Each structure stands twice: as C-alpha cells, then as structure tokens.
Amino acid sequence: MERYDIVRIIGKGGMGEVYLAYDPVCSRKVALKKIREDLAENPLLKRRFLREARIAADLIHPGVVPVYTIYSEKDPVYYTMPYIEGYTLKTLLKSVWQKESLSKELAEKTSVGAFLSIFHKICCTIEYVHSRGILHRDLKPDNILLGLFSEAVILDWGAAVACGEEEDLLDIDVSKEEVLSSRMTIPGRIVGTPDYMAPERLLGHPASKSTDIYALGVVLYQMLTLSFPYRRKKGKKIVLDGQRIPSPQEVAPYREIPPFLSAVVMRMLAVDPQERYSSVTELKEDIESHLKGSPKWTLTTALPPKKSSSWKLNEPILLSKYFPMLEVSPASWYSLAISNIESFSEMRLEYTLSKKGLNEGFGILLPTSENALGGDFYQGYGFWLHIKERTLSVSLVKNSLEIQRCSQDLESDKETFLIALEQHNHSLSLFVDGTTWLIHMNYLPSRSGRVAIIVRDMEDILEDIGIFESSGSLRVSCLAVPDAFLAEKLYDRALVLYRRIAESFPGRKEGYEARFRAGITVLEKASTDNNEQEFALAIEEFSKLHDGVAAPLEYLGKALVYQRLQEYNEEIKSLLLALKRYSQHPEIFRLKDHVVYRLHESFYKRDRLALVFMILVLEIAPQAITPGQEEKILVWLKDKSRATLFCLLDPTVLELRSSKMELFLSYWSGFIPHLNSLFHRAWDQSDVRALIEIFYVACDLHKWQFLSSCIDIFKESLEDQKATEEIVEFSFEDLGAFLFAIQSIFNKEDAEKIFVSNDQLSPILLVYIFDLFANRALLESQGEAIFQALDLIRSKVPENFYHDYLRNHEIRAHLWCRNEKALSTIFENYTEKQLKDEQHELFVLYGCYLALIQGAEAAKQHFDVCREDRIFPASLLARNYNRLGLPKDALSYQERRLLLRQKFLYFHCLGNHDERDLCQTMYHLLTEEFQL
C-alpha cells in the first residue's frame, strides 16, 4: 500500500474496509479495498476476499466497477478500483422513508420513472453477469451505488459464485435461527442477506439465477413503494410459509404504480421459482417495453358474457341492416351487446369462442360510436370472424365497409379458439390462437368508448371476456390531452394545445403530428358547423406543413378537406402530387393507406371515384386488394367491359393487375395521368396492339396534346424499326397509318380522305377509326357523313364485324336523318327479346325510334322494363327516364359522356332541338372542363 496515499475510510463490509486513496503514479483518486486486519490471518477468508477481486476484475461492464490492481504477495492483501462519487440506493431510499413531504429534487429522484430507469440499468448488469456464469447472491440496495452522473453499479462481489458451484462452507458456523433474524451477509452455510433471499434459499437450497431475480424483486418493490415487502419488526424471524406480500398498488396507491409494473414485481416475488421470470433477460425486456411504451397487457376486468349486468344494451338486430357486405342471410338475427365498461384508447380484448360461434359468425366493435344506443353503433372499427367450409375468414370493417380481409384454411379439428384484439399506438391488431391475422394502421386520434360484440348465441363465448389495459409509457405523449379534447369535440381547446405543441417542437415528430392534427381539428369543426370559411382555414392550417419534415401530410390533409367539400378533382390532385413528389418519404405510407381506404369506401358505394382510386392502388399498393375483393371488382366492371370496344376486339381476358386494366380504368374514369407511362411501357415492349388501344382511348377522350407527342416519337423512331420475320397481328406501318387517320379525325377531315388513303388497314383498325369518326360526326350533326364512311369500308370488314360494331352507328345515322322506313326494315330483323335486352345499345336505339314515330310516352314505356339491380352503360338513357332513375354520383366520366350522346339523339328524334343542343353543349363542356 506504499504506492497510495490514504485519504480516509469510506466504507466497511463483512470482510473488508474501503478507503479513498490517491495514486500519485497515475494522478488519480482510487477506491482501495483491503481485508480487515482481524481476518487477515484466516486463509479461507483471504481466499474469498481475493476471489471477490478476481471475479470483479473478470467482469467488463459499465454496471460493474472495474479492478485496477490486485495485491496479494504479502499482507495486507488489497485491490484498487475507480473512485465513483455517489451514494448507495439504500441511502436514497432511507432519505424518503416515512416522510410526508419531499423536496422537488428528492421527489424527482425517487419517482417511479426515475427508479425504473435505474432498475433497468441494474437488470442489464445482472443479465451480463449471468451470461458470464456468475451469481451475485447478495443483491440489495446497500450493494447498488448510484453515481453523481447517472451511473448505477453493482458492488460487493464477496458472495458471488459460479453457477453450479458448490456452496462454500466456511469455518464460521451460524445456526439457522441466527441467520433468519440477521440483515447481514453471513460467511457461513447460507451466503447472502436473508431479507433479500428467496424462500427456497432460506431453506438451504443452492443459489440460482431465480434467487437473484427474487432479490431484484425485493429491490424493485422498495423502489416502487418506498417500503419493504415484509411487514415485520427488526430482529423478528422471517416466516417462510403463508406470508402474503401485498401488491405495490395496495401499499402505495399515491405512487400511481401502473398495474403492469405491480404484476412484474409480484411475479419476481413468487414463492414457486417456476412462476418467476425464467431469466433476467425476460425481465429486462418487460421493463424496456414499459419504458418505450410498447404494449404489455394487464387484466383489469373479466366480463361474464352471460350476466345481464355486464351489458348496457343487449338487443336482437338484423345483421344485414348494419353490415350489408357480409355474407349472411338477410333474415339473420344476432345479439348486439354493448358493455357497461368504458374502454381505453389502448386496450386488449380476449375471447374464447366455440367453433359453432365462429361458424355462425362473431363480431367485435372497438369502440362503438357515440350514438351506439341509437342504433348507429357500426360507425368506427370492427372485426367480423366467420368459419365456412373449414376456412376461417377475418374481415376488418370501418364505418360499415370491409377494408381488409384475411382467410386461412383450418388444419385441425379445433373446437375452441382464443381471439384477441389489440388497439395500441395507431394500430388495430387481431390474433387467433396467438397468431397475427390482421394489422391495420389508423393515424387519426384513437378514442375510448364502449366495447360491443355481435353474436348469435352468448353460450358460444366459453369464458369471461378479458379486458386488458396497456402498461403504457412512463412518458405520456404530449398529444394525449389535445387528442382527448378532439375526441370530445372540444375543438377550440384542442386547437390551442395542438398549435402550442407544434410551435414548441419544430422539426420533431411531436411538432409535425400536432400541426397535422390541428388541421384535422379545424376540418372537423368546419364539418360540424358546415362553414365554408372554416374549410379554407383547414387548408391554411395544413399548408403550414409545406416543405417540412412531414410534407406528405400537407397533401393528405388537403385531400381530406377537398373530399368533405366534394371537390374530387382537387382531392385527387393533392394525392397525386404527394405520391409523385414524396414517393420515398417515411410518411408517405400514411397517404397510401388513405388511398386504399378511399378505394374501399368508393367501391362499396359504387361511386364513380372507385375507378380512379383503383388506378392509384394498382400502382402504389396492388397487394392491398384481396382475392375476394378482386373478384367483386371484376364482376362490377364486367358490364363496362361489354361496352368497351377495345375489350370486345381483344379476346384476351381483362385481368385486374395488367396494363390493359389501367387503360380500361383510364377510359371509363377519364383520369389519364398514367396514359403516358402506359404508352412508354407498350412502346418499349413493341406491343403494337396495346399502342393502338392507347391511341384509341386518347382520341376518344380528346387528348390531342398527348397524341401529338406520341406521333412525334413515332416519326423519330420509325426509321429504327426493322422488319421482323415473325408474323405479327399489326406492324409498325399499320400503327403509323392508324395514327395518321386519328390525326385526320382531329383535323375534321372528310370520310373519303380518312378511309380511302387507309384502305389496306386490317378490319380491326378500320373499326377503331370508324367508331371514332362516327361518334364525332354525330355530335357535330353530320349523320350523313356516317353513311359515307360506311360505304367506304363496308366491303373491307367481315359480316360479323358489320353487325357487331358498325350496325349501331348506321342506325344512329338513320335516326339522325329520320329515315323511318329504313329503320323499320332494320328493326324487323330483330326479335322482341333482342329489342328489349337492356344490356345492348339496341335497346336504347329502339326507344329513340319509338320516340321518332310515336313520341315520348311510347319511348318511356319501352324504357320502363329496366332492371332495378344493375345499370348497363349501353342503356343509360333508358334508366334515366325509367321510374328508378340514375343514382347520384354513380356515373363515371365516360358514362356521363355516353348518356349525353344518347340524350342528344333522343331529343333530336323527339324534335326537341333546344334540349338536343343543350346536350351537345354539355358534352363539349364535359370534355373541356373535365370533372371526376
């Protein structure tokens, strides 16, 4: 010890004394621990003292004080360590024990949050120590040093032993009775401090990782409650059996200890080692998840499903009335049960269901809407589970719309199923027997409410419904308070707080999220008040996100505003701009999720916007469309495909995930931003048929600028196109002739110039050109030109092409020219069944003929046979004047054009020129001022 200058003694232990010393060689303070003089002659204790030093020296971890030097050549033996200024955990605990009031500084140091952070560091250290095969055996507040700079280190390794090593029986023999009344580490048969020993350790069983975990449990109990788990006087014998440890929540309710942490402590202090944590790693993960706010669930309520007291409402309902998308009988009666329990915005529900219950279908609503008792319970989120033919299907429902579905075959003959539903941190998750089935992200504030179920028979719920509360985070989100105000429709109060948070955290997630929610708040207020000025303020609020770290949210917010205002062109523009400009932005997935939801919403309503959102989803998230949804979409589009010329002329199947589907959707919606990419894709693949179809659609939609650019590209590259020996349906020469014919139509040249110069074209290309020419000629009141064009190509197309694709144009021309005799001859060739088939345009043309020869009443009587369940594009005029009428917002852009063309001809046949000319004007305006 000659090398060190001893300053003062700073501590004493069972075998050693610790001094503050100065090392002049290294110019630093050190802690020097030497064996007590009265024990220095005992070789066994000397070996134990040196073993402590070597164990500490072998452990390299921030939570273990490293050893600088070990001196064992002659007495006194000692070792040196860094000197850490601080105090023990015991000192800190003693400073607050039995005190009624604490200073602000001390209250912060001993808060649950501060202590839990320290305990997590302790767990990390012991996890490392156990990984090295070492047991501490004497974990207690005395042996935990808290440094002035947030260090938390484990002291006193004198009792440490390697896992599985036999207990060292020292020469000091202490009776069991003396051990049980001692608070000191006894260098005898039982090593450690009895108050921190597990029950099995007190009975003489060897130490284990589980006994260290028990000791940590006693430490954590004191940290949480500021009291000891055993209520006994000093010196009183510890009772090994039958002593109940009260939970931390019971002992210190004023400390607001989360139920989850209370459960963690009680698990650590379980009498049976098998019921404790299996490792410190498992314990540390639970503590980490709590600190991070990850969900760890604690059972708060067990709801007996068969007791009437569990439910605020339990009434029979017709399921189809509220969930028409579900595959159930219209007369299926179920029970709607709404709980008495108010759920939290973060919660977990557990149900044990019989197979019979799932065969009949089971619904979960979380939470029900404000108007649940008034029959409006289906607003919000819910899950529907149903087994059919050994396949379990789970549907996620939002505002009565199925937005997600997952199906899986059941391999075993299970008779019971554990269903769990979690709502946590923007996500809704459903688990079946521990397996994740569905996860949905919702980025608007969650709210609390009542839990509801829909079930055929309560007997199918086999056990109590478990309602679990999330452990939550010790750091409550600053958004929680304004979120609560928003959920309660206290818009002004929510807005003030959101703006304050946004200004306080510029550039941080909390800040931009608050700014976005401020916009949502203004939007909700505007919708409630139906105030146009407030909608403008919502746009202004979202604009504050411009070019910031969450720029995509500006456009998502604006899209929501335009949706409420029914300004759908602006809504789509906002979404497109964000998708294009911020395709790689971390927040863009929120916007993509919204686009997918808008598809589900508009498709369920059979709204015309479904076609537009289908285009977007097929580009950004095609996997979001399930096989079941794909089947329904294709069925819905089938009638439109039968009225689409390029689908009729192309025998290939129209598949959902295909370039042809994108073109088809563009044609019917009039939404063409993707037309350019479709062109380049087909051009790169030399797919001439696809190029012809694209040019046909562009010409029909009057997209002359696009066509002009395509013609320029074609002219530039025509010389590079080499002839191929492979026989192809269309050559690039055909494509060129087709393009120039389209250009002639645009220039409004006569039929002879268009068709005579292209007399070598195939029948398919002639049909395309004739269709475009005839539609233009009719709307320009040039019915005679249709006859001229027909004469030029009649001999160049097969007879079936004439009947399938040209005859209707010929009938229109006769109607325009009022050729009653010719029309009579034509219609005599059709049966009454054919003339009344509303799937074909002949149905409408015959109605126009009746209007021409008999008047409006005869035509409307003919139109009155339309079906109620379907609307066919070919017979829109008939449905418009039918008693059923056309549903609002149902007609796509192309259908509105088609209807105006049909009405234009119909009013001409009636001799109502004013209405006819109005339809003509509206048709041209619709083309010029495109509206989704």
Curated annotation (Swiss-Prot):
ATP binds at residues 10-18, 33. Transmembrane segments: none annotated. Keywords: ATP-binding, Kinase, Nucleotide-binding, Phosphoprotein, Serine/threonine-protein kinase, Transferase. Residues 4-291 form the Protein kinase domain. Autophosphorylated on serine and threonine residues. Its EC number is 2.7.11.1. SMART domains: S_TKc (SM00220). InterPro entries: Kinase-like_dom_sf, Prot_kinase_dom, Protein_kinase_ATP_BS, Ser/Thr_kinase_AS, Ser/Thr_kinase_PknD, TPR-like_helical_dom_sf. It catalyses: L-seryl-[protein] + ATP = O-phospho-L-seryl-[protein] + ADP + H(+); L-threonyl-[protein] + ATP = O-phospho-L-threonyl-[protein] + ADP + H(+). One of its GO terms (molecular function) is protein serine/threonine kinase activity. The active site is at residue 138. It comes from the Bacteria. It is an enzyme of class 2 (transferase). It holds the Pfam family Pkinase. Together with the serine/threonine kinase Pkn1, may play a role in the specific interactions with host proteins during intracellular growth. Belongs to the protein kinase superfamily. Ser/Thr protein kinase family. This is Serine/threonine-protein kinase PknD.
